[in-house]
Structure formats: C-alpha cells, structure tokens
Regions:
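Secretory-pathway ectodomains
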Residues: 3-914
Length: 914
C-alpha cells in the first residue's frame, strides 16, 4: 500500500489534462494520404475518388472538397505496398468489368508479396469485407518483382524470372481459387528488370531497338508481339493508364493495334472509355514551364479526331511538379448534343506528390501530399511589427551624441502620434504585407513560422498557430544523402537582428550528379536570396556544420567537408571564422569514424585558405568486423544548461559531466553466440576518445536516441524477452567540478561517473525527442512517439537511472522514486489525446518566448503541432484567471492603505499633543 501511494503521488504530479473546450485551441492536425500510385472515380458515388498511395494507404477523397472521406492505413514497408487497385463497374480509367459483379466490395486491392494479401473493401465506408492470402513458392526477390492485373473478373499473378520465363496464375477474385489447374510458364528470355513494365494485360519490354510484348490474358500467350523502335530503347517503357499501350523513345505505341503517335517524354497520357460509350479517348497533358500553363487535349484513338469540348489551358504553378493523369470522369450537361456539353473532372498527381482535381478548365482543389514525407523542419521567429521595428532601429543606432539621440526620440514619438491619429480617422498608412498575413511576432513568442522540408524537394512555410500554408517552394533537383540521411535545414540568421531578415539554407544532393546543392532563402517570406537561391557545388558533401561565430551581418557561415576531406566555407568571405574548427565523419558500412582539424592559413596561395588535417580515427566494427553504425546522435546546438549540478541528500552537489563535444554512436551486427549485439559508445569528437561504452546482447533495431545535457536515452527491441526496452544513462564529474566556465576536450578531463538503468515499455517506440526551452530552467521531459500514433510526455523522474533498486530510504530524501522495471503509460500523459498521427516517424521541438513552454511538431503520414509545458505554465496566467476579482482586491487594498495612512497620521498627531 505504501508503494502504491508513492506511485499515485508521482503520477499525479507528472500528469496533465485537457478540457474538452481546449481541443484544437493550442494544437492542430492535418491528415494526408501520400502520393498516388493508383486511382479511379467511384461510379457508385458522384463525390468519391478511390486512391492507393506510395505511403501504403487506401483512401476515399471527396471530389467536391478534397477532404478525406475515409482512410485505411495498411501494413508498413513492403508488406503493405499496393500492387493492384481495382474498382468494380466501369471506372474512369476504362477498367473492363467481368460478368460477375461483387456488391458490397466494389474495391479490390492486392498488397505485399510474401504473402500477398487480396482484400475486398466497401467503397462507402472503407470497411474490409473479405480477405485471402497467397504465399507463392518462389524466392524473396522473385516475389517482390511480381505484378498483378485484373481481367474479366480474374486476378492474374505474374512472377517474372528475368532472362528466362514468366509464371502466370489466374485466381478467382473473391474465393482465391485457381481459375486454371496449372500455372502457365511462358518463355521470355528477352525480359530484364530495368527494361520491362506491365500495361493492362500486356507485359512489355525493350530489347535493343525493338519493343516486345506478351498478352498474358490471351489464349495463345506464346505469341510475341514485336514493334520496331527505330533506335535503341532507353530505360523502362512508360505504361499508359487505361489502355494496352506504352510510351518509349518519345512515341506512343499501341499494343493492340499498329497505332504509333509522337509523344514527348514528360507528357501525361490517359485513355478513357466512358466519355463516348466505349470509344477509347486519349487525353494528353503538356506543361509549358515558361508561362506556367498546363494544356490538356483529347483525341479519339480510332481516327485521332480532336474533341473540342475537352481542351483546357490551366494556370499551373511552378510549385507543382510534372503532372500525371490518373483518372477522368465526364457527364453530359443538360443542354446538349453528344460531346458538345461535356462536363469533366480530371484527377492529376504531380511529381512532387500533390493531388489536383481539375473541373471545366480550372483547378478545383489541391492536396499537398508531399507533407506525408517530411525530411526535416524547424520553428523560426517571426519579424517585428513596423512600430516595434522602428523602436528597435532607434535603440540600435549607436551613432551621434546625446542631443542627436534626443532629437531622434522626439521625432519618432511625433511620428507615432501622427500615425495613431491617422489610424483613428481611418486614413493611416497601409499595413505591411507581413502584418496583413498575420506574420508578426507576438509578446510570448508562441507564434512562429514552421519551415518544413519534404523528401520530394518541396518546402513549406506553415503558420504554427493556424496551420495555414503561407508560401511553398519546389526544388525538383534536391534529394537526400546516402544511407537514407535526409536533407538538412540550417538557420544562418534569425529574425532578432532587425532590420536584417532571417536566412536559412537547405543542404542536399543533386538528383543527377549527386554533388552538393544549397538553397538559401528567407524563411518568413520564402523568397530566395540573391537570384534563384540555388547554389550548385562542384563536389559531394560528406559533413555539414554551422560556424559558431557570426560575420559583420550576424550571418553564420556554412562549413562543408567534401568527399575528399577538403573543407569549404559558404560564403567564402567568412573563411577566417573556420579557424581551429573540429569536424568528424562516420562510415555506416565499415564502422569507421575519422576526426579532422580545420585551420585558416591567411598566407596560403591557394583559392581556399583552409587546411584540413586528420586528427584521429576509430574503428567501431569490432573484432569480427561485423558491426555497422546505425545511429549517431549529438546534442542540440541551441540548448542551454541552467543547472550544472544535482543536490544530494547530504546537501552536497554532484556535478554534471557536460561535454558539448560528446556524440552517441550506436553500432549493430551479427554475432556467432548471441545472434546479434548492439553497442553504444560515447565519443568525444574533438579528441577522439571513447568516454563510455555499453553492450546489449540479442538486441536489434529500431533504435531511437535522445542526447542532451549529461544524459542519454535510447530505445530498442529486446529479441530475447520479445519486448521494447528503454535505457537511460547519466554522466557526472563527481563532487568537484573540473572547469565550470570553459570546457576543453584537449585537457584530458577525468572519466565520468556513470549511472545507467533500463526500463520496459508496454508499446513499440517510433520516435524520441526531448523538450527544450529558451533558458533551460524548465524540467526536461521525454516525448515518446508510439507505434499507435500517440505521443507520450514522460517525466525524467520516471526515466532517472538513479532510481534505487534497494535501500530507497536514502533516495527518498532527494525525491527519487524507487525502481520499478515497467514504465506506466496512462492516457493522461498523451499530448495528442485522440489526434493520432499515422505512421509516426519523427518529433521536432523548439523553444518559445516563454520559459515554461516548448513547441512540438509530430510528423508521419499526418502533421500534428502543439505546445507542452513540462513544469506547467508558471510564467503565464491561466485562461480562466479572474481579472475582475483581482481588480476588486487591488482596488480595495489600495483604498484601505490610503485610509489607514490617514488614520495613522491623525493618531500620531493626537499622541503628539498629549
């Protein structure tokens, strides 16, 4: 009972609640589906589009508003990859309908490969009606390369054995029974993985200067169709939706007829059979990037006669990638003849992931599905208002004497009075563009610009209060780095240095050359700096860092280390600030870490005056050379450590080991005895010394790490116990501090005291992040992203490695709870209550203007933005604060003090006359 009471008190002090009327007041969520792979208009409803996406999502989208009607998130990874989407009844993509209808499950999907799951869905509600699985007796690679198509009510499973043959098996869609007793083996020695594609029931490949194809649904499948290309085929042929045709070498080739049409490589194509009652109509989309226009035309395939009612020229923003026509649906208007009164809706998918609906030559709505794949993000302070900017500019003016300053103050005050008078009359100066958009800094620093960079190269400026997209930029040539390392977003200058604007830089790789690319821009307006803002680097980037010192314009330079270990500074005029700088690189495959010392040599005759010298090297691959680096986590460069010690029960101080150069490195590899081993090393990247190492046996990823102040927290999966565990490590110098002002890794400080402890989590972890505040005074909590889509705010008191296993009496004086292996996960600690984030992948935190409050972004398939207060809002009045009552109390106290003062003075006078 005593321990139960202690636990209850601990949970009461750490939990936080949310009133019903506060839902959506401090947070918002935006839901997405991802980039479309398959899609069709649902003919059972005029307001529903069925889509399957790259994010393993099956969803229905409203054709009127673009909102999600229903959404089913399938299995993650290759198990949930949608290989086929079939919408029963005549669809806008011309899908042929078998003689057998299947009411109640008018949507069929095939996902995964080992096993392949065939499912029937209800398009009205999105509920699963039936399911069957197929486990083919082939190897993993062949199963992954398998494709599916639907023909006359049968599902065909095609397994290509490259360079040999094709294995084709038809199945009944609902029951899963084989329609034929034997699997057909069709000889196809001309097939190759990078030169073949499936279009309708045809399997087409390029072979030198020929296009070869097989109709897999025909009775005589052994007949090979051959078409001359005129030149050697380059790459895989591009299938045309809705028709057995491909686009190759700038031409459209029909596989059912001898038709051949000239076609540009990036032109979108779609064939539809519902516009003119079974007549195949070819729709073609061409983008004019000079004028930002999209031209869509339609021709009858039989005689290539143009359909004038379907010819649109649409404004197509440069923030949208090249389009792909997914589906079309046309109906006859009330006024007319056949073809003359067509009203059409067209579904498009852009290369950047955006989903567009075009109706009668205008874009009806756009869904920015690039936000379903967030690479990195950051919160930026907004600019000052015009009045605050004028005051700031006056205070920053250091020139002149006291009389000049007095004159400027009088002039500015007179100008403020004039503007106030004109504003009262309604004829004041027009507000600035930022003020009209509401992009002005608030008093508490809670209103910020959220800059989000996506994997497709699209950049968004989002209001963190309302969720509005203020600006969008598309960088089609930008991709992430090797080993799935995403693009980097770095802040070179914040909005504090008025009137200089804020400046950020995005670092990535060129999609074609793999050399470094920079995009320098203003994060508040989204406008590029100096021309287009894109800087092409003549080298590949292996490491990135911001310099600590700023130049004359308060700009932090960017230090880059190329693949030849040569240092570069952007801009080059700030090279002098890179002197005596240390960098490191980590090779994930070999487990090697290397340190470098960068020096500035003003007497150098080379173009760059920087020299890079190797300083240390560490091999973390182990004796078996099997260990590979799976994670490398440093500390947040903007964090502040307020308290450098911890008060013990005997009133002594245990000083924290606060090493800003400490990096946590995790390696993982197979082992002959323990199956696999994970090692965690704390490495000083300036001196190259390993401060601490820890080994976990029979442990495997996913691994998530948080490194802050003097502690490290990481989660992993314990394969032996079949559960998720989380380990916390704390480092202390001892009861004497080496140097409390300046830390130097070259002075060989003593090895730290290490406290460590492991705990059990009842649910799998998807992300970890610590809260951060402006001064570091507020207690730090750990935000745990769960596989369920929830985010738990875990107090450090529960993760404290000093929680005693025995003798809890001593620790009770310090307020430390006794050790229990299981960590509680009550609903009260979930910061997103029922606003779950599907496929949660990351959490980003940033300080606000209030020391008590931390801003949080949770991203996955959805976006969720909120704010948390680990130590409550001690610096902010509550919303329900009774201002009327406090006014009455203050008025009464003030009046009483004056009355008492008068009475006391009269009493003193009377006593003096006695």
């Amino acid at each position: 009972m005593m321990w139960a009471g202690v636990w209850l008190l601990a949970l009461v002090t750490t939990c936080s609640g949310l009133y019903e009327d506060q839902i959506g007041k401090f947070d918002w969520r935006q839901q997405y589906v991802g980039k479309i792979v398959h899609g069709a208009f649902d003919t059972t409803s005029v307001d529903r589009i069925i889509v399957a996406t790259e994010s393993n999502v099956l969803a229905a989208i409203s054709a009127k508003t673009g909102d999600i009607v229903w959404r089913q998130v399938l299995e993650s990874g290759s198990r949930g990859e949608v290989k086929l989407l079939h919408v029963s009844n005549p669809s806008a993509t011309g899908a042929r309908v078998g003689s057998r209808g299947h009411p109640g499950h008018d949507v069929i999907t095939v996902t995964g490969s080992l096993p392949a799951l065939v499912r029937g869905w209800n398009s009205n509600t999105g509920t699963l009606e039936w399911e069957w699985s197929l486990l083919p007796s082939v190897d993993d690679q062949a199963a992954a390369d398998a494709v599916w198509f639907e023909h006359d009510g049968l599902l065909y499973h095609v397994v290509p054995v490259w360079g040999s043959h094709l294995e084709v098996t038809p199945y009944q869609a609902v029951s899963g029974q084989q329609a034929r007793p034997m699997t057909s083996r069709i000889a196809a020695s001309w097939t190759a993985k990078d030169r073949c594609a499936l279009t309708e029931s045809f399997f087409a490949c390029t072979s030198k200067d020929q296009l070869l194809a097989l109709d897999l649904a025909a009775d005589s499948s052994s007949a090979i169709l051959s078409k001359p290309l005129g030149a050697e085929g380059v790459g895989r042929p591009r299938p045309v939706r809705g028709e057995a045709a491909v686009i190759q070498n700038g031409r459209y080739y029909s596989l059912r007829t001898d038709q051949k049409l000239a076609f540009a490589g990036k032109d979108a194509a779609l064939v539809d059979r519902t516009i003119q009652e079974g007549e195949p109509i070819l729709l073609r989309g061409t983008v004019d990037r000079v004028n930002n226009r999209l031209l869509i035309v339609a021709h009858r395939l039989r005689d290539f006669v143009k359909l004038d009612p379907i010819e649109f020229t649409i404004d197509y923003s440069d923030t949208l990638g090249d389009p792909e026509l997914i589906s079309v649906r046309c109906k006859q208007s009330n006024s007319g003849n056949s073809g003359a009164g067509l009203v059409c809706r067209m579904l498009l998918s852009a290369e950047d992931g955006a989903i567009l609906l075009i109706q009668q030559g205008k874009i009806k709505w756009v869904r920015e599905e690039a936000l379903a794949e967030v690479a990195t993000a950051d919160f930026l302070d907004l600019t000052l208002s015009d009045a605050e900017g004028a005051i700031e500019e006056e205070l920053n003016n250091k020139n002149g004497d006291v009389y000049g300053a007095f004159q400027r103050r009088i002039t500015s005050q007179a100008l403020h009075l004039k503007n106030l008078f004109l504003h009262i009359l309604g004829v004041g100066p027009a507000p600035s563009k930022a003020q009209r958009a509401g992009l002005v800094r608030d008093d508490f620093g809670l209103h910020k610009m959220l800059v989000v960079v996506t994997n497709s190269g699209k950049v968004f400026g989002i209001d963190n209060v309302s969720g509005k997209h203020h600006w969008i930029r598309y960088l089609p040539s930008f991709v992430g780095f090797a080993n799935n390392v995403p693009m980097k977003l770095l802040v070179q200058r914040t909005s504090r240095f008025y009137p200089l604007p804020a400046q950020c830089v995005i670092v990535g790789r060129d999609r074609m050359t793999l050399n470094g690319l920079l995009y320098i821009f203003n994060p508040i307006t989204g406008q590029p700096v100096q021309g287009g803002g894109v800087v092409e680097l003549p080298y590949s980037v292996s490491q990135i860092s911001l310099l600590h010192k700023t130049g004359p314009d308060f700009l932090k330079a960017l230090l880059l280390l190329d693949d030849k270990n040569v240092a570069h500074v952007v801009p080059e005029t700030l090279e002098v600030y890179a002197d005596n700088f240390y960098m490191f690189t980590a090779n994930h495959q070999t487990g090697q870490m290397n340190g470098f010392h960068v020096q500035y040599n003003p007497s150098s005759t080379k173009a760059s005056k920087l020299t890079t010298t190797p300083s240390w090297q560490i091999d973390l691959s182990g004796g078996s050379k099997r260990q590979q680096i799976i994670a490398c986590e440093g500390k947040n460069p903007i964090e502040h450590v307020h308290s450098q010690g911890r008060v013990m029960a005997d009133r002594s101080v245990l000083y924290k080991y606060i090493n800003p150069n400490l990096v946590a490195v995790a390696t993982h590899g197979a082992d002959n005895i323990h199956k696999y081993i994970m090692n965690v090393h704390l490495v000083d990247v300036v001196s190259g010394s390993i401060v601490f190492s820890m080994s976990h046996k029979r442990v495997r990823p996913p691994l998530h790490m948080v490194h802050s102040e003097n502690w490290l927290v990481y989660s992993y999966f314990n394969d032996k116990a079949r559960r998720t565990e989380i380990t916390s490590i704390e480092l202390y110098e001892g009861k004497t501090q080496t140097n409390g002002t300046v830390w130097s890794s070259l002075d060989a400080p003593p090895l730290p005291m290490v406290e460590r402890q492991s705990y059990i989590l009842p649910v799998a972890v998807s992300a970890l992040k610590e809260t951060i505040t402006e001064k570091g005074i507020t207690s730090k909590h750990i935000l745990i992203g769960l596989s369920t889509g929830a985010v738990a705010e875990m107090s450090w008191a529960l993760l404290d490695p000093r929680r005693p296993v025995t003798s809890p009496e001593k620790a009770r004086e310090e307020g430390i709870m006794p050790y229990m292996p299981e960590l509680p996960m009550p609903h009260e600690i979930l910061v997103n209550y029922n606003q779950t984030v599907a496929n949660l992948r990351g959490i980003h935190t940033a300080p606000s203007g209030l020391e008590s409050t931390c801003l949080v972004l949770v991203h996955g398939l959805d976006l969720f933005v909120t704010r948390v207060s680990p130590s409550k809002t001690f610096d902010l009045l509550k919303e329900d604060f009774d201002y009327f009552l406090i006014t009455i109390v203050l008025t009464a106290l003030t009046t009483t003090s004056f009355v008492v003062k008068q009475l006391a003075s009269k009493k003193i006078v009377k006593q003096a006359w006695k």
